[in-house]
């Protein structure tokens, strides 16, 4: 290992949030879960109606369950900027479709982790929901969406 090189520590890469277009800006560790504060890396400041450059209006926080590390639930708090167009008054949010589906409560990585748990490791929905820190109903409904994608991709 004489030629071993190391990169600087990067929590975004370690948690694979960079694959979802997110960057970790802070963390808080609790005994029963971990909370990661994130921001969306890509800018989305152009109006989708008229094409003018929007003005940052405010920020909202979207909470997602992410894949657990060491069976500790990981919750991601994503700061999503809202923009307003000065020309047509249209208001929109930054695009975070790379990280999660609209109105989803699990990140795309959490859905992938849960499907792997069901298909490969034969875990129950209750165990997956517990590991993700969500209710059984949320885990079951999100897995139903992933199951349709999994089965639909086979044909």
Role assignments for model-derived ranges:
Residues 1-61:
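A broadly conserved sequence feature marking short terminus-proximal activation segments
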